[in-house]
Each structure stands twice: as structure tokens, then as C-alpha cells.
UniProtKB/Swiss-Prot annotation:
Pathway: tRNA modification; N(7)-methylguanine-tRNA biosynthesis. One of its GO terms (cellular component) is tRNA methyltransferase complex. Residues 164-169 are annotated as: Interaction with RNA. GO terms for molecular function: tRNA (guanine(46)-N7)-methyltransferase activity. The gene is trmB. This is tRNA (guanine-N(7)-)-methyltransferase. Substrate binds at residues 162, 194, 232-235. The keyword Zinc does not apply. Keywords: Methyltransferase, S-adenosyl-L-methionine, Transferase, tRNA processing. Residues 1-11 have a biased composition (Basic and acidic residues). It comes from Corynebacterium glutamicum (strain ATCC 13032 / DSM 20300 / JCM 1318 / BCRC 11384 / CCUG 27702 / LMG 3730 / NBRC 12168 / NCIMB 10025 / NRRL B-2784 / 534).
Length: 255
């Protein structure tokens, strides 16, 4: 499936309307977003100035073209981790300096969130973070080759708490299969949620994907950084309501 007119009036803009959704040729469950539209937001003047200057270097928009990660980061052979739904990038910017040997790609729909992360990256002189604006499932499916990623992170995804909206949750059998395909053997999937019902939902799915071996939490021998370093905005709101943070780790089975 190709994306139609990809022209943009401004850097990093997405087409209006509903997000693009791939049709997968299997019987697994994938998020069906229905009436959800792209979130649009206004940047401050300073954010817009930085965006115009830095986006061509640091950012991309969802497209039907595989990313050449080595070329984008300017180095060969480094590990690559994709964070789905990076929000304002609080965890991203805190973790990246501690894993300087790893390429971090933050995927987010909300432009002001990416702009805030960009500000943290530029001010902190963090050189191992890049950004893609788009839906996480589509970005993974269209822009990363199978078996190319060392890690995938999904921190505090939208819980879609109403029963009729559960089908929109990103943690389902289909995405778990997609994550497994994109990970290298030995690659790690890390998920965190503070929503009790979503945690129960995930608990029912931890062994649904045969290519992912569930490691539980914590996993002391995990080959990647799992300490998120800071409390994100959404995590903080959950803690204020006495929510329990549930975390999950899987490793793609070795060949």
C-alpha cells in the first residue's frame, strides 16, 4: 500500500483525516482506530524556529520507504531501539545519554510532543535520538525492515478504558507479532502501563506470540537499559491516583 500525496505545507506535517491503516494478511488482532484523527497542536515561536531548523536533520514523517538507520545516525553497526508513543520524550531524553552507543528512534503523532523532545535533544546535545511523526504500527510496518531492531519500547500507551474501545489498544496479538518480526533474534520488547485493566489485558497476552519469550519483570539479565530514569507526566498522574506501575519484558527467540 502506498501513501498518497506526501507533500507538506510545513515540515513534519501529516495529512488531515484518519490515520493510515495497513491491512495485514493474517487473523491476528490489530488496533482499529475508527474515528480517531491526527492530533494537531500549535508550537511556540521558539519551538517552531527550532523545528524548522532541526527537523530536516532529526525528523521524518511516516512514508513508504525503509529508513537507512546507519546513514541517518551517521554511524554503522550501532544497536537501534524504537520507542512507540514517546509523548513529550521525558523518558527518551533521560535514557538516551545513558545508552550513547544505541540509536534511539522516537515515534509520536503529536507534534508539540516531538517539539518538546527536540528541545531536550538539542539543548542537551544528545546525538543518538531521531524522531518519526506517525502512528507507531504504520511506522514499524512501513519504515523498518524485518529483523532490524534491537529493542522496542511502549511506555504508558493509551489504555482505551471503555470496553467498546479496547480494540484500539496497541498491545494485541497483531502488534506483538509485528514487534517480533521487526526485532532481531535476542531483541527486547519493553512495555509499561499504570492502568489496572490494561495490565490484566496484557497479562492474558504475555505468551500469545510464539516468537517472543516472556521474561517477566524485573529481568536482571536484560541486555538493555530498562530503568526509565524519570517519572513521565502520565506516570505521575497515575501515581497520584495510587496506580501501580506494571512492566513487561519479552525477548525474541534466538535462532
Amino acid at each position: 500500500m502506498s501513501i498518497s500525496d506526501n507533500s507538506r505545507d510545513q515540515l513534519g506535517e501529516l495529512p488531515a483525516g484518519r490515520p493510515l491503516q495497513s491491512d495485514f494478511d493474517n487473523d491476528l488482532d490489530y488496533p482499529r482506530l475508527g474515528s480517531v484523527t491526527f492530533r494537531r497542536g500549535t508550537l511556540t515561536e521558539n519551538q517552531q524556529t527550532m523545528w524548522d531548523e532541526k527537523w530536516p536533520e532529526l525528523g521524518r514523517v511516516l512514508e513508504d520507504e525503509l529508513i537507512d538507520v546507519d546513514a541517518w545516525f551517521g554511524r554503522e553497526g550501532a544497536k537501534t531501539i524504537v520507542e512507540i508513543g514517546s509523548g513529550t520524550g521525558t523518558s527518551t531524553a533521560a535514557m538516551a545519554p545513558l545508552e550513547a552507543d544505541t540509536n534511539i528512534v522516537a515515534v509520536e503523532l503529536y507534534k508539540p510532543g516531538l517539539a518538546k523532545l527536540m528541545g531536550s535533544v538539542v539543548r542537551g546535545e544528545i546525538d543518538n535520538v531521531r524522531m518519526v511523526r506517525g502512528d507507531g504500527i504504520e511506522v514499524l510496518n512501513r519504515m523498518f525492515a524485518d529483523g532490524s531492531l534491537d529493542g522496542i519500547r511502549v511506555y504508558f500507551p493509551d489504555p482505551w478504558p471503555k470496553a467498546r474501545h479496547n480494540k484500539r489498544r496497541i498491545i494485541q496479538s497483531g502488534p506483538l507479532n509485528l514487534f517480533a518480526k521487526k526485532l532481531k533474534p535476542g531483541g527486547v520488547l519493553h512495555v509499561a502501563t499504570d492502568h489496572a485493566d490494561y495490565a490484566e489485558w496484557i497479562n492474558e497476552l504475555v505468551e500469545v506470540e510464539p516468537l517472543l519469550e516472556y521474561k517477566g519483570w524485573p529481568w536482571e539479565e536484560c541486555p538493555q537499559l530498562t530503568d526509565r530514569q524519570v517519572i513521565t507526566k502520565f506516570e505521575g498522574k497515575g501515581l497520584e491516583k495510587d496506580h501501580v506501575i506494571n512492566e513487561y519484558l519479552w525477548q525474541k527467540v534466538q535462532n
